[in-house]
Structure formats: C-alpha cells, structure tokens
Amino acid sequence: MTVKTALRQGYDLLAEAGLAEPRLTAEVLLLHALHRERIYLYSHPEHELSTLEWLHYGRYLHERLKGRPTQHITRVQEFYGRPFRVSPATLIPRPETEHLVEQALQTAGGARTLLDIGTGTGALAITLALELRARAVATDLSFDALQVARHNAAALAAPVDFVQCDLASALTGPFDLVVSNPPYIPAAEMATLQPEVRDYEPHLALLGGEQGTEIYHRIVPQAERLLTPGGWLIFEIGYQGEAGVRGAFAHGPWQEVSLTCDLAGLPRVLRGRYTP
C-alpha cells in the first residue's frame, strides 16, 4: 500500500467515525508509523509501506477510533513551536494556552524569575523560561506529571526546577511572575466533556471543584506571599470563570486586573499586578 492510499483510507475511516480533523489526524498517525517529517507524505506519495509500517499505522488508527487522543498515541504535542512529550498523567497542552504565554511576554517581559503552578507537561514554565531567558520553578501534585515535565525541560535545555507539592505550598519565593493554568472544569460539567478528554486526560488536571474557580481562590493568597512587589499573577480561565476568578483578586493588594479573550472571543486569560 502506498502513502497516498494509506492516507486516503485513514481519512475515510476517521471521517466516517465523525472524528475532528480526519485529514490531519491521518497524516500525524501515518508520520508516526513512518518516523518521517510531514513533507515526506507529499514528496513520496508512491512510497510503499512495509508490513511493519502498515501494522503500526493500522493499530494507531484503531486506537484513535476507540477514542484515544492522537497525542497519547504519538506521545507528543507541539506548544509554542516546540515539541512536548505528553502522557496520560498530563493534560495535553492546548493552543488556547499560548494566549497566556503571549500575555506574560507582553506584561512581564522583564521577569527574571517565574513560577508555574500545576505545570503538567511543563509547557508554560519551559516556554516562558526560554522566551524570557528567566529562571523558572514549576510545581505539580503528580509525581508522574513531573517526570514528563523534567524530560521536556531536559530535551529543550530549559532552566526549570521542579517541585512536587500542592500548588505552591513548599516554596518561599520571591518571583517576578506567577502563572497557572489550574483545573477549572466545574464538577457538574465533567460528564459533558468530550469522551477523549473525560476518559483519557487526568481528572486531577481538569476538575476545578463545584464552581470551577475554587483553586484560583487558593492560589491568589499564595501568590501574595511569593511575588515581588509589582509582580504579576496570570491565569488561564474557563469561559464561564471570569467573575469567580476576579473575586479572588477583590480583597487583596491587586491592581490592573484585566481580561484577555482568545481568538474565539471567549474569556481566556486574567491577570493582576501585586501592589502591597
């Protein structure tokens, strides 16, 4: 079977199953089976797959059709132009989270020290450490997630130290910038998530309590303890979470609290400046 035929058959199977982005998914899975770069698919459409390549490709398609996320099959997801290893212990980095990176670079471009609370794959901490040329610390409650994050930091030569703890409870600071993409799915909405999210990604990284904003209210007081005066706390938030997260800033020494929406016009990033 040729590359061209394999792509067409993969697309047909994925499209008939109603899966999103069937063409792109077929390409990614075939590339994973071939251990090739994307340009190879179009420069060698008549390449004949070996028996082993076809078996791998067929298995990957079968796993995706059962609902397993593509990123769990390939074990990689790109974020801000860099490859990050993922695992079932980590949330898969989303393109929307790149808005947090952009806001951090614009708002706190001079930060020399930063903290990422609930790091998962390490995508935020690693990206900001490299883009800002800053020293980063990243925390997570999950030992397995931190193993993935450490691998990513080593692979990308990022200056990040990792600490296993609940939020930032084990840290003393100070930091110029604190970022977090904490769990923000309300408990009542967990059952409504897409199966590939609900059944495959860690609930520890998804479930944000009854309202979906409880963890923000725990992070803000810790940020007050850890930030340098004039430092920034920047969150990713859920599309219905703005009011609840703003409430976490309401009674502390915070100014310039502002919201940024994503490309779909949904509330995505909320930030505040620590001014004691």
Give the residues covered by each predicted segment.
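Conserved RecA-like P-loop NTPase ATPase core
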Residues: L29, A153, N181, V197, ...
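Conserved AdoMet
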Residues: L30-Q106
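Conserved Class I SAM-dependent methyltransferase catalytic core
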Residues: E210-R273
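Non-catalytic accessory regions of SAM-dependent methyltransferases
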Residues: M1-Y42, E46-L49
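Conserved SAM/SAH cofactor-binding pocket of Class I
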Residues: I92-T192, R218
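Conserved beta-strand segments of alpha/beta enzyme cores
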Residues: P83, R135, P159-D161, Q255-S258
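Mobile active-site "lid"/loop adjacent to the S-adenosyl-L-methionine
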Residues: Y184-I215
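A general structural signal for well-ordered alpha-helical segments in protein cores
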Residues: L7, A26-E27, W54-G58, T70, ...
